[in-house]
Amino acid sequence: MASSAHSDSASADASAEIPAEILAPAPWSTPADDSEHLRITAVRTFLTAPQGCPYVIVRVETNQPGLYGLGCASDPQRTLAIRSVVDDYYAPMLLGRDPSDIEDLHRLLFNSGYWRGGSIGQNALAGVDVALWDIKGKVAGLPLHQLLGGRAREAADAYTHVDGDNAGEIAEKVLAAHERGYRHVRVQVSVPGTDTYGTAPRDAAEARRRELRAGSWDSLAYLRHVPPVLREIRERVGTGVELLHDAHERLTPSQARELVHEVEDARLFFLEDALAPEDAAHFDQLRAAGSVPLAVGELYHDVMMYLPLLQRQVIDFARIRIPTLGGLTPTRKLVAAVELFGARTAPHGPGDVSPVGMAANLGLDLSSPAFGVQEAATFREATREVFPGTPVPERGRFHGTGLPGLGVDFDEAAARKYPVPEPLRHDRWALLRNGDGSVQRP
């Protein structure tokens, strides 16, 4: 098994002494030997899997005793590559620098690779960036949402997930979630004979088939089966609860248009990822196909990918994943654009985003007028042990803790109890194929 903490990395060793000279320091920087000025003394990465999927946690340490920041750099499919970028490339550039110059450091690291962007570099950058915001909040004695402008709302509405085989079963789960306080519920429907996203396996045999990706995907079966079930769920639960559905980028543009037309009467709060990023040019046609609110973006790795869609007003919700977008520094600018173009945010927050990442989401949720709804993972007891202060919704809403910075800590000793598997094979979930044997998007 792989070690859960990678603190013996080259970055940690190299941080034993702050370099006498900082490579290309900012012109306003104080001398590196000024011991009274706040400095970055170490950048450490940790791997842990208390939720079942691998987390990459970044800790930026300073020369002020006890002052450090945490960031989430988690992409379950490229865990080791992300850790390497932080340890081998970003950490040496950060040693000795002032952690308060977040914008400058973000641009420095982003441009350092020359061939910029992509999920690996962006997740690594996000881990550092969010940790710097955490430090800034702790120095100021303010929670993240106060650094970002202060509260725009008392609490952030969350949505939870339910699934099932039929409308009756799913409707019961929706109403049960509503009883627990959730006003927004994502509903996923099992399609007989096909490997359906977002639904639990019926038995151990099906679970094993899914693990090996021995099943296949059938878009036509999905289109025949799911819309009438969604319409019936709406009839059963009434209009007092919002319903969401995720197509998970598995449809062609023409199939997506058909889906939009067929689910009109289900009155969805939003339909997520009806189109893959590669098919974004078709959103104009999708918008014309019906009035169903459209959400997209969890796969986007650059905030500029949203801009044409916002400008053309063809999406209603930006599904933001802070780690994949490079951290809070670019994401807060995207959130401002979302507001200006009249859309709303719906940040990504399932189990592959750590509690550190969720706390970063909440900083934006509580401070932005453009906030729509926050996806909410059910964090395990083990996860809450590793991350003291893990955000947990109360009656379907996140309130924030009011603690300085992110308000979440990291227990290194507890993290070691939940190592990531070795070798990592988390990307096997994406080995989905169509009935004819061709590769299908996950």
From Swiss-Prot:
Molecular function terms from GO: magnesium ion binding; mannonate dehydratase activity
The entry's keywords: Lyase, Magnesium, Metal-binding
GO biological process: amino acid catabolic process; carbohydrate catabolic process
Disulfide-bond pairs as recorded: none
Co-factor note (free text): Binds 1 Mg(2+) ion per subunit.
Entry's EC annotation: 4.2.1.-, 4.2.1.8
Site (Important for activity and substrate specificity): 350
Binding site for Mg(2+): 246, 272, 298
Active-site residues from the entry: 197, 248
Sequence positions that bind substrate: 161, 298, 319, 348, 352, 375
Reactions catalysed, as given in the entry: D-mannonate = 2-dehydro-3-deoxy-D-gluconate + H2O
InterPro entries in UniProt: DgoD-like, Enolase-like_C_sf, Enolase-like_N, Enolase_C-like, Mandel_Rmase/mucon_lact_enz_CS, Mandelate_racemase_C, Mandelate_racemase_N_dom
Pfam families (alphabetical): MR_MLE_C, MR_MLE_N
Required cofactor(s): Mg(2+)
Main enzyme class: lyase
Function: Has low D-mannonate dehydratase activity (in vitro), suggesting that this is not a physiological substrate and that it has no significant role in D-mannonate degradation in vivo. Has no detectable activity with a panel of 70 other acid sugars (in vitro).
Family: Belongs to the mandelate racemase/muconate lactonizing enzyme family. GalD subfamily.
UniProt-recorded name of the protein: D-galactonate dehydratase family member SSLG_02014
